[in-house]
Amino acid sequence: MADRLRSQAKLEQLQARYVGVGNAFTTKYEWMVNQHRDTLSSVVGHPPLLAYMATALGEPRVQVRKNLLEKMIMPCGPPPPSNQF
C-alpha cells in the first residue's frame, strides 16, 4: 500500500512540475499539443538537430528556426469544438 501511495505522490509531483505529463482530465488534443511543442522546442534548442533539419529542408538555419517557432503557436491546428454549453 505504501508503494502505491508513493507512486501516486511521485506522479502528482511530476504533473505539477511538467505540464506535458498530463493528468486524468487532459484531453487528447492537449496531450498532442504538448508533445508537438516539446519536440519543436527540442529541435530549436539543440543546434545539431536544427542544422540537420535545415540541411534536409535545404533552407538556412535561421529560416527553419523561425518556421519552427511559428509552428509552436498552434502545432496541431485549431482546437476541436468543446461540448460544454
Curated annotation (Swiss-Prot):
InterPro entries hit by this protein: SF3b5/RDS3-10, Splicing_factor_3B_subunit_5
Annotated disulfide bonds: none
Highest taxon of source: Eukaryota
GO CC entries: cytosol; nucleus; precatalytic spliceosome; U2 snRNP
Annotated family: Belongs to the SF3B5 family.
Protein species of origin: Schizosaccharomyces pombe (strain 972 / ATCC 24843)
One Gene Ontology biological process: mRNA splicing, via spliceosome
The organism's taxonomic lineage, starting at the top: Eukaryota, Fungi, Dikarya, Ascomycota, Taphrinomycotina
Protein name, as recorded: Uncharacterized protein C211.05
